Amino acid sequence: MAQDVLTDLNKVRNIGIMAHIDAGKTTTTERILYYTGITHKIGEVHDGAATMDWMAQEQERGITITSAATTCFWNKNQINIIDTPGHVDFTVEVERSLRVLDGAVAVFDGKEGVEPQSETVWRQADKYDVPRICFVNKMDKLGADFYFTVDTIINRLGAKPLVIQLPIGSEGGFEGVIDLVEMRALTWRGDSKGDVELGAKYDIEEIPADLQDKADEYRAKLLETVAETDDSLLEKYFGGEELTVAEIKAAIRKLTVNSEIYPVLCGSAFKNRGVQPMLDAVIDYLPSPLDVPPMEGHDVRDEEKIIIRKPDSTEPFSALAFKVAVHPFFGRLTYVRVYSGTIASGSQVINSTKGKKERIGKIFQMHSNKENPVDSVTAGHIYAVIGLKDTTTGDTLCDPQDQIVLESMTFPEPVIEVAIEPKTKADQEKLGVAIQKLAEEDPTFRTEQNQETGQTVIKGMGELHLDILVDRMKREFNVEANVGKPQVAYRETIRGTVDKHDFTHKKQTGGSGQFAKIQIKIEPMEVTAEKTYEFDNKVTGGRVPREYIPSVDAGIQDALQVGILAGYPMVGVKATLLDGAAHDVDSSEMAFKIAGSMAFKEAARKAKPVLLEPLMAVEVRTPEEYMGDVIGDLNSRRGQIQAMEDASGVKVITANVPLSEMFGYVGDLRSKTSGRAVYSMSFGSYAEVPKAVADEIVQKNKGE
């Protein structure tokens, strides 16, 4: 069966389950796997207990740990469920998961409606134009209110929901849904425990008499929305003709794929009610790989040259690695979304991001709780591959003869760091393993050894990012460690030019001495992602022997590592070696290296040194009533407001704010806006620190 499904991409859905942390994402995903498992194994006597055991174990470990993408089958269609990260602060990771999905199911808590975190995830999906259907979950919960939740989708998200189901009963009496497309009732009358075996079957009945008026009212709204998509449907509708189920579904699909509306369904995943119709809606309304625009990438040699790849097996092979995970038996698994072409196990491909050859080892499709080996990969699908040695998250794999880069991987430099000290020798070894594994998975995570203290310093994109990395070290790798306070990664530079600075290094202590004489010029230069320092040699007539010139450069580079104001690395400096002198016996590479380092330090003191700090590009989305407070708070943090605009029911404020002022911002924003505003933050640029603030930092560093 699997092979039949694979070839017809119209029958494939690559989806994510998006939700607030408590809206029931795990339970919903589990139930999807459970029901699709039953359907996939028709004719097999099912041992309910064994499946539930497996689900409980999954729940304990968290479903996202076992697999970043799970394949299941529903009514002869294939659904690949891609894990969407729970933390929206990691834009790189969120971007990547949203990039490999074609559609999503947004799960809402039927009592709480749209919560702040669901708002954040929703806005992120808006940004990438991901078509969605909404599942109002927990309809059996005390206080659950379907109509309230739909209102919050309109008011808090500014979205256009299209109600295609209504609940029958509520709280403890919730027993089914009214299907407004086919105008029928679906009921699950299992025992009080919501028996799963009974949950797998439901009855199709007449709409209850007491809900007929409500159903007619919402059906009329549905038909009106649907009829507006097409002139012939509009004519039919106003002519009093009945629209067919096929016509209604086709129109809802068209509107959903274009993100014009979001179909809303309801149920209780925990009580096994409403999950199967939701799966039907995934197939009926969410896009297949053929419904989304073809993939764009650029030429390996020319970033300006755009290349298009269609989801077709006749096109050259291209795929994006979107997750690297460690499997208990197979070791390193790389999850890939194949965008074009096909390739067999054992083939050689090229990692065009890094320019390295890779060999595809075993290929799996992850079927809920087991790996299903396949011989080859096909466009439009998600696979897990073994054997890729150099490929990390975000790399492109492609045909060596027809190369493409799908994602330009210029990751922002880390702006925040924290020292981490293992408690024991054993922890030190485990820390090494943890760092290596985490760096493979997360390209924005860096690490270095502090030469002076011997501590390991980990660097990341923000406070929350570091918290989660440290938490993962403890949880997944059992590293017990003391963690320091987060530190901002300041830099130093110069604003003035020193045209000539002479320095002589001379040491005579019996035997051969040390001698090096140099004259250098230093001046500011523009910092780019590729270049923060430049060295130029203008010595003529061999006054400094050629073999010693690289030593002067190396000495200056050493001095750049520890700035003269507060010991931070220096950037944006051009140094030119103008002149010098050497001694036949006493000169050496080491003597010229010391001279380079000392000359630079002395010259830099005269070149108007200044401190630089990372400025963050901050975007806050807030309901209008809190806008004044949010702007006032950003101003008090030395922020500069760049723009204010409207976006689907909220105000969007963009500002540049120094990172040092953003510690603890998440809590302050939550309290100022009752948890309704959300923000994202990414590195913008380095800027000069105001003198009063700089003096304080310099004093603090000298005091320590």
Curated annotation (Swiss-Prot):
Gene3D superfamilies: 3.30.230.10, 3.30.70.240, Elongation Factor G (Translational Gtpase), domain 3 (3.30.70.870), P-loop containing nucleotide triphosphate hydrolases (3.40.50.300), Translation factors (2.40.30.10). GO terms for biological process: ribosome disassembly. The keyword Nucleotide-binding applies. GTP binds at residues 19-26, 83-87, 137-140. It is found in: Cytoplasm. GO terms for molecular function: GTP binding; GTPase activity; translation elongation factor activity. Residues 10-290 form the tr-type G domain. One of its GO terms (cellular component) is cytoplasm. SUPFAM superfamilies: EF-G C-terminal domain-like, P-loop containing nucleoside triphosphate hydrolases, Ribosomal protein S5 domain 2-like, Translation proteins. It comes from the Bacteria. Keywords: Cytoplasm, Elongation factor, GTP-binding, Nucleotide-binding, Protein biosynthesis. Catalyzes the GTP-dependent ribosomal translocation step during translation elongation. During this step, the ribosome changes from the pre-translocational (PRE) to the post-translocational (POST) state as the newly formed A-site-bound peptidyl-tRNA and P-site-bound deacylated tRNA move to the P and E sites, respectively. Catalyzes the coordinated movement of the two tRNA molecules, the mRNA and conformational changes in the ribosome. Belongs to the TRAFAC class translation factor GTPase superfamily. Classic translation factor GTPase family. EF-G/EF-2 subfamily. This is Elongation factor G. It comes from Clavibacter michiganensis subsp. michiganensis (strain NCPPB 382).
